[in-house]
């Protein structure tokens, strides 16, 4: 179903409340990555260009709800936002202070300091919606949470619409899940099958090839009868992995498993690594990355792909030397003619680490939200926007 778009509304002289996801990583009060602030800029600038006054809402971290906590204050975010916009940004400490005027920007302090935010309290939702004439939901990274500022306010506001960032995210995932150019290849990595079981089952229905990596691949290898040594895998989920492999055969989908792997005695820096065929992993070794023949196998499928969705690395890339497979995969995808969507915190972190983010088709800003979309779930705030359209 369609949603009302911010671009289509007359915002001249109006107060526009924009829910963004400015939940940036911080260390000692310093922002270590401002990607989410930069992603919000076009929406805020569009509202200003249309002659609106802007009030921005966001959460930061996980403070005790209803209590002010300086370490979770949005003050550093207000300063960085002001630098990037090239104009002052007022930090409002309370709902009563959250006022603005055409051409001006106010950032309300962390919405999680407000009692009732996470419980989706109707009274708080009405107050947040009532801060302006138009309520813009633009926080894809929080769209999977039914909170007062994400879902409740959207349902309560006089006028509610989707911002450009949220629209771009939904359109990217629509291209992957609902109207994809085929063949479609999904790469699902990460540590545990248990966190991605619904995702794997849903994707298998939609894609042509499902590639598994990381600890997830270890569980599938064990389910296929291979010895995986000391590798991280989930013994209790071997039947589930076997079911998924059987379903792939039934649906005539490809589910290629690694054919060779990089191993070490433990997951730690500067380990002595070894290359083994999957049938020859010693009992004292851990599988920590894919080998070159596996990479070649995966590239064979990716070379034919028109659409690729990547959720999770194929090795322990955060520790050298176990990132070679993930890096090589990222480099291959960066040169691909396919439409590539990278969604999920670790795979996004990987392409950023290797300086390849700008060469991917679309980088999602929301980890949990993108995971829920890939699982086939409806995002509460998007459902609310669709109901209002």
From Swiss-Prot:
This is Phosphoglycerate kinase. ATP binds at residues 196, 318, 344-347. Substrate binds at residues 21-23, 36, 59-62, 112, 145. InterPro entries: Phosphoglycerate_kinase, Phosphoglycerate_kinase_CS, Phosphoglycerate_kinase_N, Phosphoglycerate_kinase_sf. The lineage of its organism: Bacteria, Pseudomonadati, Thermodesulfobacteriota, Desulfovibrionia, Desulfovibrionales. The keyword ATP-binding applies. Pathway: Carbohydrate degradation; glycolysis; pyruvate from D-glyceraldehyde 3-phosphate: step 2/5. GO terms for molecular function: ADP binding; ATP binding; phosphoglycerate kinase activity. Monomer. It holds the Pfam family PGK. It comes from Desulfovibrio desulfuricans (strain ATCC 27774 / DSM 6949 / MB). GO terms for cellular component: cytosol. PROSITE patterns: PGLYCERATE_KINASE. GO terms for biological process: gluconeogenesis; glycolytic process. Belongs to the phosphoglycerate kinase family.
């Amino acid at each position: 179903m369609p949603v009302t778009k911010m671009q289509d509304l007359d915002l001249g002289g109006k107060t526009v409340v924009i829910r963004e996801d400015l939940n940036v990583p911080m260390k000692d009060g310093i922002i270590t990555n401002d990607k989410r602030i930069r992603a919000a800029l076009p929406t805020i600038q569009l509202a200003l260009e249309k002659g609106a006054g802007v009030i921005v809402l966001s959460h930061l971290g996980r403070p005790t709800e209803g209590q002010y906590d300086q370490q979770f204050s949005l003050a550093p975010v207000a300063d960085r936002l002001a630098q990037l916009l090239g104009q002052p940004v007022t930090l409002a400490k309370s709902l009563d202070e959250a006022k603005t005027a055409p051409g001006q920007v106010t950032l309300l302090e962390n919405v999680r300091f407000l009692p009732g935010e996470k419980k989706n309290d109707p009274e708080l939702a009405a107050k947040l919606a009532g801060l302006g004439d138009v309520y813009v939901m633009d926080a894809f990274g929080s769209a999977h949470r039914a909170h007062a500022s994400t879902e409740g306010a959207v349902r309560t506001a006089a006028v509610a619409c989707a911002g450009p960032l949220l629209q771009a995210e939904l359109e990217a995932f629509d291209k992957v899940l609902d109207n994809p150019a085929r063949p479609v290849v999904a790469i699902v990595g990460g540590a545990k099958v248990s966190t991605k079981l619904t995702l794997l089952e849903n994707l298998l229905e939609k894609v042509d090839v499902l590639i598994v990596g990381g600890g997830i691949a270890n569980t599938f290898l064990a389910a296929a009868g291979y010895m995986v040594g000391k590798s991280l895998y989930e013994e209790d989920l071997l039947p589930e992995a076997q079911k998924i492999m059987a379903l792939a055969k039934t649906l005539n989908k490809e589910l290629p498993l690694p054919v060779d792997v990089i191993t070490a005695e433990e997951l730690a820096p500067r380990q002595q690594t070894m290359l083994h065929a999957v049938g020859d992993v010693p009992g004292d070794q851990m599988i920590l990355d894919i080998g070159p023949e596996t990479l070649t196998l995966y590239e064979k499928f990716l070379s034919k792909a028109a659409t690729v969705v990547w959720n999770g690395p194929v090795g322990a890339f955060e520790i050298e030397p176990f990132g070679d497979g993930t890096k090589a995969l990222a480099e291959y995808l960066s040169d691909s003619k396919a439409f590539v969507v990278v969604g999920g915190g670790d795979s996004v972190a990987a392409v950023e680490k290797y300086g390849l983010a700008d060469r991917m088709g679309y980088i999602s800003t929301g980890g949990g939200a993108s995971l829920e979309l890939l699982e086939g779930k409806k995002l509460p705030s998007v459902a609310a926007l669709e109901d209002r359209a």
